[in-house]
C-alpha cells in the first residue's frame, strides 16, 4: 500500500472513531427514568436487607394521571417476590398490584403504597404468567415517569 493511501486510511479510521464512539459511550439516558428507578431501588432497600435478590432489569415508562400499564412476568411457585414502584414526581400517588392469569388479585396483604412509592408482594401458588399493574393514581405532572423493579428469594 502506498504511503498516501495508508495515511488516508488511518485518518479516515480515526475520524470515524471520533464520530461514532462518543455517541456509543455517552448514550443519552433520560434523567427522569434514572430518578424514578432510584426511588424504586430506595423502596427495595429494606427487603434486600431481608435477603431478597434484586434483578438488574426493570420496566419504566410514563403515564398520565389515572392511567395504568400492565407488565407480564413469569413467576415460579416456591419463590417469593416483591415488586417496587417509584416515581420522581413529588406529590404523585402511584400503586402496583399483581393479578394471576385468571385476572384475580394475587398479591399478599402486606403490599403497600405511600406517596410516590408502592410495593406489591406475592408468593405464587402456581408457576405461570402474572400481570403487574402499574398505576399513576394522581399526579401534578401531565406525564409521570415511573420505574418498576423486582426481587425474589
Where are these regions (language model features)?
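Exposed aromatic-hydrophobic patches
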Residues: 71-72, 117-123
Amino acid at each position: 500500500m502506498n504511503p498516501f493511501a495508508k495515511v488516508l486510511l488511518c485518518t479516515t479510521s480515526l475520524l470515524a472513531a471520533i464520530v461514532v464512539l462518543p455517541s456509543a459511550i455517552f448514550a443519552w439516558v433520560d434523567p427522569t427514568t434514572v430518578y424514578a428507578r432510584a426511588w424504586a431501588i430506595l423502596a427495595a432497600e429494606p427487603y434486600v436487607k431481608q435477603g431478597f435478590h434484586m434483578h438488574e432489569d426493570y420496566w419504566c415508562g410514563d403515564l398520565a394521571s389515572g392511567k395504568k400499564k400492565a407488565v407480564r412476568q413469569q413467576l415460579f411457585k416456591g419463590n417469593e417476590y416483591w415488586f417496587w414502584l417509584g416515581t420522581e414526581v413529588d406529590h404523585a400517588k402511584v400503586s402496583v398490584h399483581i393479578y394471576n392469569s385468571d385476572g384475580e388479585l394475587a398479591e399478599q396483604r402486606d403490599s403497600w403504597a405511600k406517596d410516590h412509592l408502592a410495593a406489591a408482594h406475592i408468593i405464587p401458588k402456581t408457576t405461570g404468567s402474572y400481570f403487574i399493574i402499574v398505576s399513576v393514581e394522581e399526579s401534578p405532572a401531565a406525564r409521570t415517569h415511573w420505574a418498576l423493579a423486582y426481587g425474589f428469594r
